[in-house]
Amino acid sequence: MEKLQKTVDEWKAMLDPEQYNVCRLKGTERPFSGKYNATKTDGVYHCICCNAPLFDSTTKFDSGCGWPSFYAPIADSAMVEIRDVSHGMIRTEVTCAKCDAHLGHVFPDGPPPTGLRYCINSVCLDLVPR
């Protein structure tokens, strides 16, 4: 997959301030504030920065954490996992494989069949209904 690269000014021109803060500066939206937290619409969630498909709605579940949660990405190649030791914690950050947008984190406390919980910021996503 060819990487999508843009300048800071190009990202700022195409993203709103919250999207830029979360996707490009590794911020986090407030829990329970995102538009996709409780959404049950059937479709595919794409990266807001580059439109790459990231998650299928069939893998979305209510984890109660305040952010959209999925038990698997649409493909293993859709994202990159990075060790994150910020804020005094050890976590695994997930970023878009195509454009390096920060999406959220993955935790080992999800449901079967994977046992994983991809905790993703809504502002990083664009849901395309089926």
From Swiss-Prot:
Binding-site positions, Zn(2+): C47, C50, C96, C99
Catalytic residue list: C119 (nucleophile)
Enzyme Commission code: 1.8.4.12
Cofactor note: Binds 1 zinc ion per subunit. The zinc ion is important for the structural integrity of the protein.
One record GO biological process: response to oxidative stress
Top EC group: oxidoreductase
PROSITE patterns, A to Z: MSRB
GO CC terms in record: cytoplasm
Keywords of the record: Metal-binding, Oxidoreductase, Zinc
GO molecular function, one term: peptide-methionine (R)-S-oxide reductase activity
Matches recorded under InterPro entries: Met_Sox_Rdtase_MsrB, Met_Sox_Rdtase_MsrB_dom, Mss4-like_sf
Pfam families per UniProt: SelR (PF01641)
Signal peptide interval: none
Homology family: Belongs to the MsrB Met sulfoxide reductase family.
NCBIfam families tied to this protein: peptide-methionine (R)-S-oxide reductase MsrB
Protein name: Peptide methionine sulfoxide reductase MsrB
